[in-house]
């Protein structure tokens, strides 16, 4: 009997370890009462005003916060392809100029979705989608485009960044109403590949976070901005859980598709 119990415990430990290692996309919360929880913000971060990140938008599916996004110019927003995969443009809007995803600011309809032609839903490679807006934006101190890197512009490991959004905080005590941000350093590409697997982390991906965890993007932040020195270097994409030790957040690297963004949007 004791041998059977020992075998069962060994199998259980292996299953749990395997589950923790499986990367999960920062899938949006389609319904406000998702079984994943009702929180909507960055883990381990701090509240900010949208004027601190005026390029930030809330991408909304049938009037509910789904993902983040970044203003590129008066007609285009960049988000993650896994946020728009399988959806029609008429079901989407963006809210801009508000620190709250559910009120205030300006709401604009999405006219067209352009996902990257190489987007792979199975490994989340090329996780980029451009959204053409129905009407032009009016810029102000709370609505501004973000600067973009040049094609293939490198980002040094250890570069401090800011990631923002309304994704899950994993905390029952924090309000889900206000925009949050966290400062996280970029991680060496090889270190990130060792954390996950060499096949999981492609050249279109960029990692950021602390070895000890504690600060990260999470569900509901997908598609949102990772900015360094005023430039949009990443799009919130996926990770193993949220803010887990040893597993940095994974972002879609913007510099790799700079020419594609320019070709589609003119930016």
Curated annotation (Swiss-Prot):
* GO annotation, biological process: digestion; proteolysis
State the top-level EC class: hydrolase
Alphabetically, the GO molecular function entries are: serine-type endopeptidase activity
Q: Does the keyword rRNA-binding apply?
A: no
In this protein, the active site sits at 82 (charge relay system), 127 (charge relay system), 222 (charge relay system)
- Which tissues show it? Expressed in the midgut. Expression levels drop a few hours after blood feeding and pick up again 28 hours later.
Gene Ontology terms: cellular component: extracellular region
Disulfide links within the chain: 67-83, 192-207, 218-242
Q: Which Pfam families match?
A: Trypsin
UniProt keyword terms in alphabetical order? Digestion, Disulfide bond, Hydrolase, Protease, Secreted, Serine protease, Signal, Zymogen
Does the keyword section mention Transmembrane helix? no
Q: Where in the sequence is the signal peptide annotated?
A: 1-18
| Entry-linked InterPro entries | Peptidase_S1 (IPR050430), Peptidase_S1_PA (IPR009003), Peptidase_S1_PA_chymotrypsin (IPR043504), Peptidase_S1A (IPR001314), Trypsin_dom (IPR001254), TRYPSIN_HIS (IPR018114), TRYPSIN_SER (IPR033116)
Q: Which reaction(s) does its UniProt entry say it catalyses?
A: Preferential cleavage: Arg-|-Xaa, Lys-|-Xaa
Task: Give the main location.
Answer: secreted
Mind telling me which residues the site (Required for specificity) is annotated on?
Answer: 216
Summary of the function given for this chain in its UniProt record: Constitutive trypsin that is expressed 2 days after emergence, coinciding with host seeking behavior of the female.
Family, as annotated: Belongs to the peptidase S1 family.
PANTHER family attached to this UniProt entry: GH13245P2-RELATED (PTHR24276:SF97), POLYSERASE-RELATED (PTHR24276)
Record-given protein name: Trypsin-7
In which organism is this protein found? Anopheles gambiae (African malaria mosquito)
């Amino acid at each position: 009997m004791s041998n059977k119990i020992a075998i069962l415990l060994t199998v259980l430990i292996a299953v749990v370890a395997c589950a923790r290692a499986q990367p999960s996309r920062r899938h949006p919360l389609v319904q406000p009462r998702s079984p994943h929880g009702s929180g909507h913000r960055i883990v381990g971060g701090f509240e900010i005003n949208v004027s601190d990140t005026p390029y930030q938008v809330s991408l909304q599916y049938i009037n509910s916060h789904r993902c983040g996004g970044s203003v590129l110019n008066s007609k285009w927003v960049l988000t993650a392809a896994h946020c728009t995969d399988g959806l029609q443009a008429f079901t989407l809007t963006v809210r801009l100029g508000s620190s709250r995803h559910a009120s205030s600011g300006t709401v604009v309809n999405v006219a067209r979705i352009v996902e990257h032609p190489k987007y792979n839903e199975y490994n989340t490679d090329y996780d980029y989608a451009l959204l053409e807006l129905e009407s032009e934006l009016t810029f102000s101190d709370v609505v501004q485009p973000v600067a973009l890197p040049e094609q293939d512009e490198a980002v040094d490991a250890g570069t401090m960044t800011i990631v923002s959004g309304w994704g899950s905080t994993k905390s029952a005590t924090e309000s889900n109403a206000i925009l949050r941000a966290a400062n996280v350093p970029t991680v060496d590409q090889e270190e990130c590949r060792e954390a996950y697997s060499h096949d999981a982390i492609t050249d279109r991906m960029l990692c950021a976070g602390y070895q000890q965890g504690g600060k990260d993007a999470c569900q509901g932040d997908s598609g949102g901005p990772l900015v360094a020195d005023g430039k949009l270097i990443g799009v919130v994409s996926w990770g193993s859980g949220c803010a887990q030790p040893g597993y940095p957040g994974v972002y879609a690297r913007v510099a790799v598709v700079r020419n594609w963004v320019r070709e589609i949007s003119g930016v």
